[in-house]
C-alpha cells in the first residue's frame, strides 16, 4: 500500500490514539478499534468514513514497518522541532512587537506629557504676567491712596494750626454754676443738658463734671471759634446762669478783652483770671492730665 504525502503531514500516533513509543501489538490493537468504529460498512451515511478507514490502514502500514516508522519518526521529530522554533520565533516576534508597541505608547505618552507641560508652562507664564499687571495697578492704587491720605492729614494739620494759632492745643473752658452738695438735680445741669447748650456752638470733644466740686465742669471744644462763641453767648439756665471762663487755648485778643473787662466789673473774679492765665501757658499735653485728674477725683468721691 502506497503511503501518500498528505498522510505524512499527519500525526499518525494521534490518528491511532497511541503513544510515540507504543509497540507493534499496541499499534495493531489501536488500529482494529479505530477501524471497526469507522468502517464504511458500519457508517454508510458518513462520506468521510472510507477516507478515515484508508488513513488508518496507511498508518498501520507505516508504524508496523521498522524502517518506515524510523523514517517517519525522524521527519516527525524534525517537523516538531521546526514547529517549536517557529513558535519561539513567533513568541520572540510577538515580544518584539509588544515591546515596540509599548515604546511607541511610551513615546506618545511622553510627547503628550511634554505638550501638557508646555501648555501648563504657557498658562503659568500668562497668569504671572496677568498678576504682574494687576499687581502694578493695585500698587499704583495703594500708592495713590497713601498720597491722598498724606495730603488729607497735611490739610487737617494746616487747618488745625489755623484754628489754634493763638492758643495752645484744643480750647478748654471752665463752667461754674450754683449747686449745693445735697442737690440731686445738680442745679439743673446734667451732662446731657450741658452738651445740649454747648454743642450748638461747635463740636465738643470732652465734657467732665466734677462730683467733688458740685457746680463745676470742664468742656473741651474742637475749635477756638466754637469756644469763643460759647464764652460770648452762652448764659445757661435763666434761674441758674452759667459762668464760663477760659482754661486753655484762649486767643490773645480774647485775653486782652478779658483783662480790660475785669476793671469794668467783669463776671470773672481776680482769682479766676489768674487761674486762666496760668492754664493758658500750659502745653497741650496737660489736657489729658487735667481730665485724668478730674476723673480720679470723681472716682474718689467727695471728702467726708
UniProtKB/Swiss-Prot annotation:
Sorted alphabetically, the Gene Ontology cellular component annotations on this record are:
cytoplasm; spliceosomal complex
Q: Which residues form the J domain?
A: 11-76
A Gene Ontology biological process noted in the UniProt record is:
spliceosomal complex disassembly
Q: Which GO terms describe its molecular function?
A: RNA binding
Pfam families this protein is in?
DnaJ (PF00226), RRM_1 (PF00076)
Task: Kindly give the SMART domains that the UniProt entry links to this protein.
Answer: DnaJ
Residues modified as N6-methyllysine: 264
What keywords tag this UniProt record?
Answer: Chaperone, Cytoplasm, Methylation, Nucleus, Phosphoprotein, RNA-binding, Transcription, Transcription regulation
* Disulfide-bonded cysteines: none
Provide the residue span(s) of the region labelled Disordered: 79-145
Role description: May negatively affect PAX8-induced thyroglobulin/TG transcription.
The name on file for this protein is DnaJ homolog subfamily C member 17
